[in-house]
């Protein structure tokens, strides 16, 4: 019996190369090798680096822990890397965990008790902390004190344990999902932005040197243009293009070979993959380019609504292919042009669609 592939299914050979979330390969030794070890080595995020240099210098002069920090922005932009750099600059340890791993009070209690003076605790996806764990962090962040409840019912007692001064660094893709009491306890809240092509080119050339991958600057630019403004994706695409060039029997990554390899992987000239194009084409063809809600797009494409919102939408919004209006998501004329669907552009649709409708 022949099995037909649904039009809503990606090609069987396609990897999810453009997800900003780390793969298993990227969480192991290879990622450690390409991670910058100091602020000087860190490429991009100039405003953030300038602020952190002042914070580090002041904390060192006073011999104090850095104030608590909150990093927010799309995944893959370097929040974890920046936490590790801060620890290295301060000469302290960095304990890394994620909010979903802190299910029970003893999970966070054990970590806090074992921190050394001025150590850094990095909590990824901090917006997903449960209420009990979050409330344990309040006195820990404010007074370096851990309040532990011993016993149950009327016999319950609260025991306070002193903690050494430490720095909590939270990372989130949804800063608006943090409760006000938690957000207000961070002394510095910084946004990480998408990277420019020039910055990604420098990152790719640096990674190519570390991995001993021959590449021209033009080849690096071609990969950078398709990397969705995200270093993690840039390094991933570099490795896949390296494989393509090797199998082709070539010795150096040129812009032509980079373009060929990425086209074969369904990554187009703007960094859109199969799913990006499916989302945009569905909104254009099935909903006639009219404003449409997130759940409707998810149902029509067969993709998870959360995945569309957190993985695909940020970049489409960034490059101006998608707008959010009070009535729903709207595809812009720039996206029609990129997809070769200008003929389907509604006649009353201006070439520069405003971000909001009035």
From Swiss-Prot:
NCBIfam families: PRK00080.1 (NF000868), ruvB (TIGR00635). Has 3 domains, the large (RuvB-L) and small ATPase (RuvB-S) domains and the C-terminal head (RuvB-H) domain. The head domain binds DNA, while the ATPase domains jointly bind ATP, ADP or are empty depending on the state of the subunit in the translocation cycle. During a single DNA translocation step the structure of each domain remains the same, but their relative positions change. Its EC number is 3.6.4.-. HAMAP family: DNA_HJ_migration_RuvB (MF_00016). GO terms for cellular component: cytoplasm; Holliday junction resolvase complex. It is an enzyme of class 3 (hydrolase). This is Holliday junction branch migration complex subunit RuvB. Pfam families: AAA_lid_4 (PF17864), RuvB_C (PF05491), RuvB_N (PF05496). DNA binds at residues 324, 329. Mg(2+) binds at residue 80. Disulfide bonds: none annotated. GO terms for biological process: DNA recombination; DNA repair. It comes from Microcystis aeruginosa (strain NIES-843 / IAM M-2473). The RuvA-RuvB-RuvC complex processes Holliday junction (HJ) DNA during genetic recombination and DNA repair, while the RuvA-RuvB complex plays an important role in the rescue of blocked DNA replication forks via replication fork reversal (RFR). RuvA specifically binds to HJ cruciform DNA, conferring on it an open structure. The RuvB hexamer acts as an ATP-dependent pump, pulling dsDNA into and through the RuvAB complex. RuvB forms 2 homohexamers on either side of HJ DNA bound by 1 or 2 RuvA tetramers; 4 subunits per hexamer contact DNA at a time. Its main location: cytoplasm. Residues 269-358 are annotated as: Head domain (RuvB-H). The gene is ruvB. Residues 8-22 have a biased composition (Polar residues).
């Amino acid at each position: 019996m022949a099995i037909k592939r649904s039009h809503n299914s990606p090609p069987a050979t396609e990897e999810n190369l453009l997800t900003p979330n780390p793969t298993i390969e990227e969480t192991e030794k290879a990622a450690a090798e390409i991670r910058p070890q100091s602020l000087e080595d860190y490429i991009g995020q100039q405003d953030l680096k300038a602020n952190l240099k002042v914070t580090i210098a002041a904390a060192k002069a006073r011999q104090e822990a850095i104030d608590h920090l909150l990093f927010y922005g799309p995944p893959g932009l370097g929040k974890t890397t920046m936490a590790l750099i801060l620890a290295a600059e301060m000469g302290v340890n960095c304990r890394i965990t994620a909010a979903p791993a802190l299910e029970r009070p003893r999970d966070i209690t054990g970590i806090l008790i074992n921190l050394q003076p001025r150590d850094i605790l990095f909590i990824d996806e901090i917006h997903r902390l449960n209420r009990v764990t979050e409330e344990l962090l309040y006195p820990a962040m404010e007074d370096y004190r851990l309040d532990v409840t011993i016993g149950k019912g009327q016999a319950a007692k609260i025991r306070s344990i002193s903690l050494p001064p430490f720095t909590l660094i939270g990372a989130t893709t949804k800063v608006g999902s943090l409760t006000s009491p938690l957000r207000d306890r961070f002394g510095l809240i910084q946004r990480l932005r998408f990277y420019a092509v020039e910055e990604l080119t420098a990152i790719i050339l640096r990674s190519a040197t570390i991995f001993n991958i021959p590449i021209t600057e033009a080849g690096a630019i071609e990969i950078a243009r398709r990397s969705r403004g995200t270093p993690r994706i840039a390094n991933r695409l570099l490795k896949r293009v390296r494989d393509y060039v090797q199998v082709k029997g070539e010795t150096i990554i040129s812009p032509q070979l980079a373009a060929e390899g990425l086209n074969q992987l369904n990554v187009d000239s703007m960094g859109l993959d199969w799913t990006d194009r499916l989302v945009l084409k569905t909104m254009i063809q099935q909903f006639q380019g009219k404003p449409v809600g997130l759940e409707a797009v998810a149902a029509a494409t067969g993709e998870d609504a959360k995945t569309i919102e957190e993985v695909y939408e940020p970049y489409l919004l960034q490059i101006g292919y998608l707008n959010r209006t009070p009535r729903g998501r709207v595809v812009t004329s720039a996206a029609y042009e990129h997809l070769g669907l200008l003929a389907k552009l509604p006649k009353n649709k201006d070439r520069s669609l405003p971000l909001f409708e009035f």
